[in-house]
Amino acid sequence: MPGHLLQEEMTSSYTTTTTTITEPPSESLQKTVPLYLEEDIRPEMKEDIYDPSYQDEEGPPPKLEYVWRNIILMALLHLGALYGLVLVPSSKVYTLLWAFVYYVISIEGIGAGVHRLWSHRTYKARLPLRIFLIIANTMAFQNDVYEWARDHRAHHKFSETYADPHDSRRGFFFSHVGWLLVRKHPAVKEKGGKLDMSDLKAEKLVMFQRRYYKPAILLMCFILPTFVPWYFWGEAFVNSLCVSTFLRYTLVLNATWLVNSAAHLYGYRPYDKNIDPRENALVSLGCLGEGFHNYHHAFPYDYSASEYRWHINFTTFFIDCMAALGLAYDRKKVSKAAVLARIKRTGDGSCKSG
């Protein structure tokens, strides 16, 4: 929905490999290296690593500036989705299957694409896979890859501060969708603007999507999913629009948003009890593997975003399938020893690992 774009004022070889990330064995190193760095060995990327030195400035937060266009468009979208829910029983089976497939591909454009590949660099992808993921990400319409990744890196680096775009301390609604309905906090703009995004600026595919994002999302998120059922198997236009477009898109949005809201409020913290992100299996069901959030914030460089790889984690299965085809490689996976060490040191005692 175009209203998303108004939240802020716009100014080699085919060998597949898995990298195991291990914890430094030296006790002296553990005493001198900050917790948020001691298990991360990616020399090329540090912008998603939590920075505990950042603190909010004292004083009241600035007054919220509502983006009424976003509010109105988001309300209309959800009303259209509710009507789509009513139309589900009268829709053709092919339409429901089409909406489901579109949902899954869109979710992978977020999980396997902008999240694990472009935001965190947890694995590498060949050009055919990157093209598929950039298309899938455009289908999902949650801001272009560059902006999404910048916000997400800020979310990790400055988690639960005013510089976190969807700071969960401000409540469920704000972290779920409210942050998209207001102008960004000045700290989000300031800190986000200072992040090193040179890796994405150098990627032509990401910059191409950013340049042509508005017409691309109009085609891939709205026109195509509506046109196909109506044209190819004679679905009623209103069903095509409200079921395969409005309802499907709304479900994709809310499944993703639940990672920011529910997975920061409800669940266990087996890996680090000192941070708000939680393990939430229900969230993982909806977003195909992104709900193991305590683990993900403890180890943001793990390509599976979970200790258990394929368990309620279709996205990891997808990446592994792409690796088997030679399209994904250099998948980074934290070692069992490092995970157990973290559980012992900072876990809440709820983990059954080991």
Swiss-Prot record:
| EC number assigned by the record | 1.14.19.1
Give cofactor(s), names only: Fe(2+)
Annotated Fe cation 1 binding lies at: 115, 120, 152, 156, 296
Which superkingdom, per the lineage? Eukaryota
Sequence positions that bind Fe cation 2? 155, 264, 293, 297
Which InterPro entries does this UniProt record tie to the protein?
Acyl-CoA_DS, FA_desaturase_dom, FADS-1_CS
Residue ranges of the TM segments: 68-88, 93-113, 213-232, 237-258
Region: Disordered; residue ranges are 1-28
Phosphoserine modifications at? 198
User: Which Pfam families does UniProt cross-reference here?
Assistant: FA_desaturase
Q: Which GO terms describe its biological process?
A: monounsaturated fatty acid biosynthetic process; response to fatty acid; unsaturated fatty acid biosynthetic process
Query: Where can this protein be found?
Result: Endoplasmic reticulum membrane
In this entry, the parts of the chain located on the Lumenal side of the membrane are: 89-92, 233-236
Q: Which GO terms describe its cellular component?
A: endoplasmic reticulum membrane; membrane
Name the chemical reaction catalysed here.
octadecanoyl-CoA + 2 Fe(II)-[cytochrome b5] + O2 + 2 H(+) = (9Z)-octadecenoyl-CoA + 2 Fe(III)-[cytochrome b5] + 2 H2O; hexadecanoyl-CoA + 2 Fe(II)-[cytochrome b5] + O2 + 2 H(+) = (9Z)-hexadecenoyl-CoA + 2 Fe(III)-[cytochrome b5] + 2 H2O
Kindly state the positions of the motif Histidine box-2 in this protein. Answer: 152-156
Q: Where does substrate bind?
A: 70, 143, 150-151, 183-184, 257
Q: How is the cofactor bound?
A: Expected to bind 2 Fe(2+) ions per subunit.
| Motif mapping: Histidine box-1 | 115-120
List where the motif Histidine box-3 lies: 293-297
Record key words, sorted = Endoplasmic reticulum, Fatty acid biosynthesis, Fatty acid metabolism, Iron, Lipid biosynthesis, Lipid metabolism, Membrane, Metal-binding, Oxidoreductase, Phosphoprotein, Transmembrane, Transmembrane helix
Q: How does this protein lie in the membrane?
A: Multi-pass membrane protein
Relate the protein's function as given in its record. Answer: Stearoyl-CoA desaturase that utilizes O(2) and electrons from reduced cytochrome b5 to introduce the first double bond into saturated fatty acyl-CoA substrates. Catalyzes the insertion of a cis double bond at the delta-9 position into fatty acyl-CoA substrates including palmitoyl-CoA and stearoyl-CoA. Gives rise to a mixture of 16:1 and 18:1 unsaturated fatty acids. Plays an important role in lipid biosynthesis. Plays an important role in regulating the expression of genes that are involved in lipogenesis and in regulating mitochondrial fatty acid oxidation.
Q: Can you quote the domain comment?
A: The histidine box domains are involved in binding the catalytic metal ions.
What's this protein's family per the entry?
Belongs to the fatty acid desaturase type 1 family.
What protein name does the entry list?
Stearoyl-CoA desaturase
Question: What species was this sequence derived from?
Answer: Mesocricetus auratus
Gene from which the chain derives:
SCD
